[in-house]
Amino acid sequence: MSDLFEPFLRQIRHDLGGTLPGKEAQMGMAPLFRARNGESYDTVRADARQGGVLALFYPQRDRLYIPLILRPTYTGVHSGQVGFPGGGFDPLDTDLTATALREAYEEVGVHPDEVIVLGHLTPLYVYASNYLVQPTV
């Protein structure tokens, strides 16, 4: 592992072990129109689907990278968006970490056995698509 990556991993492990800013940070980044439309991070619909995404960091040539994907163009609410690799929970997934790892393998070709899971960020409810998303780091 590179000299750059090891201190980064230690810091991320430390930070994930503490209190995360969660919904406060999410609201700080939310579009202003959310409140006017009655969208809420606090009210997750009972029929919300579960999803997982992977924030994957990797070193290459003394730099850190994080892969993002460009979603295809279609008629849905996430058409053409840039995001972390991820998607919906499959009944064959053991949990949402498995979902994130499976989707990352399908979307960017990273084998789950090559990933060191450090922890999770605060789940995010995506009102527009009715998904409760668990980010895995």
Segments and roles (model prediction):
Residues 1-83, 88-137:
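N-terminal leader/linker segments that precede catalytic domains of diphosphate-processing enzymes
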